[in-house]
């Protein structure tokens, strides 16, 4: 037995030594790359670059064929694709149990959220039936539970309360206040569905990407606070005035505080008992969720128990506890939306449409990622829109999906929207036969159901701490969205938060991180010298990079930051150079003027000398020596004038910084790393051309590196390249540009071998 143990120990030691040797080998492993130095022209030739072939997608869209029609049908009615292939044995039992569990939650939430929307409870059941069945036909998510949702209900409630508070508005509809609220709600649902279907058909599902996660979470948190405030009147049993618009939450809280002496004790006790019972059941479900096949239906049991106690004890008569009252049974015929309300509701409808879709698609993507399938955002928009659009004809109010019900649908074995269809059929049974049994249900119990279900959204206050550590800008978005939604109401708050979020995007694009790059030793990698102490600037070469793309909003800032990082006051140096050149030119002009005057004097002297042909021989002879001396002297003066003119013509213009007595930059080449550019506009092109011009004025050659082909094509289309700036100034990488700048300063680009040791 000892021998095998020793051999095993030796084997383990050998394996450990081998793994250590392999690790050291990996750490020492180098590779050697040898390739030509490539500028853009050479790269295009080597890679056979050419514009991508244009695909006429519109031809495919408008092509008529049986296959195309079948594909469109399956795309827009997904149930026809997956239902024929539904694995009954594997999934049906789970979907049935899941649908029953969701329906048990859907019933109390539908009744409660109808009150939240300012409507009779029965309309909450309608909104839990029609839209759910429509989504079963057109939706692509297998797990989300469509129906009433607190945030949507409070948004609808704010609209119904604000409009019906005006007596003239109610009289204009020729209806009671309750009927007017119903008309506003189902007309609003029709408009919301119209917006969602229209946006989905034109593939505007990407719009929701502009609603960041901090914005959506903050908005739903603020909405949950408004939900909580709106339920205080049912908890305390007090009558409140209708407040709408900015600061309505503040006014409501102040009025609740003023009305506290009129609290109905029986209502408060009922709400507290129901709330405690719901919390205990939820805690029990969380603790025993692994042992229980289905969660305990705490909400349904609470509603049944509260209804029985209220009926037996006569809470309404003896303790003045408000109850739901008469609930009509049976389905109601469809009605047309009130077209005269369209202009009044269009703004609120668009806000509700965006929020509802944002919540639905975010939950849908979470479950799709968890279970490995794909959710089509555009089809989801159409499906949710049809749910609201058709629901509007059957007097439903706008719906979305609920996180709590969706989690129950997933955790209880739901695999497809068959679970949703089962839950809608169960709700149909309640509507047709059992709805009237809940007429003695206390409204305080429904308020307790709503408040307890806000637990998940109230937990989102913890985002403040996590965002403080992770990203202060996202925290700012969260806080601004929350405050704006609380103070300005849901519709204006959403608009303010979206505008603020987009404004922050613009500001962050205008304030990118600018850096000077240095080479990491023995590599072709270049990093920010301020962050990497081992990265060293290449002598004579300055490499500059921005963390954001360059466009009209930050082009000037890019140019200013470049000059600042280079440590050279380019504008001042150019101004001084121009002044020195102008001064030199003025000096040359003065010299030319002086020489010109000398020339004129000499010419006058030459022209004054003449020979009189009539002089006698004796005069000529006597003046021969004298005349020859004068001619020699005059010839010398003429030669001086000619030579001075030639010197003026050949005098060089001294324009270099050194000859002008100006300081020279500490580098001879500037490389712009444009790897972060995703597009360019005309302002960007003009800014880059100005950079080339200005730095060449101070004797610094400029190169571009790591520019993607689409951006190069845009530069070419914008007439960036000309005789002075060619594609030979654009290089495949920063290292190519650095190598060229060091070895080919102010020369025609060639193709030396670039050897890089890594």
From Swiss-Prot:
Record region (Disordered): 585-608
Following inactivation of the gene, the phenotype reported is: Mice show an important decrease in salt absorption in the intestine and failed to develop hypertension on a high-fructose diet. Show a reduction in pancreatic duct fluid and bicarbonate secretion. Show enhanced oxalate absorption in the intestine leading to hyperoxalemia and hyperoxaluria with high incidence of calcium-oxalate stones formation.
The residue spans the entry assigns to the Cytoplasmic side of the membrane are as follows 1-117, 209-263, 314-340, 402-417, 507-758
According to the UniProt record, list the residues that bear Phosphoserine.
751
**Entry comment describing in which tissues the protein is expressed:** Expressed in kidney (at protein level). Expressed in spermatogenic cells. Expressed in intestine, kidney, testis, brain, muscle, heart, and stomach. Expressed in the submandibular and sublingual salivary glands.
List, for all copies, the residue spans of the domain called STAS. 531-741
Relate the induction remark in this record. Answer: Up-regulated by dietary fructose intake (at protein level).
Function per UniProt? Apical membrane anion-exchanger with wide epithelial distribution that plays a role as a component of the pH buffering system for maintaining acid-base homeostasis. Acts as a versatile DIDS-sensitive inorganic and organic anion transporter that mediates the uptake of monovalent anions like chloride, bicarbonate, formate and hydroxyl ion and divalent anions like sulfate and oxalate. Functions in multiple exchange modes involving pairs of these anions, which include chloride-bicarbonate, chloride-oxalate, oxalate-formate, oxalate-sulfate and chloride-formate exchange.
> Which NCBIfam families does the annotation name?
sulP
Q: What is this protein called?
A: Solute carrier family 26 member 6
Source organism per UniProt? Mus musculus (Mouse)
| Gene field | Slc26a6
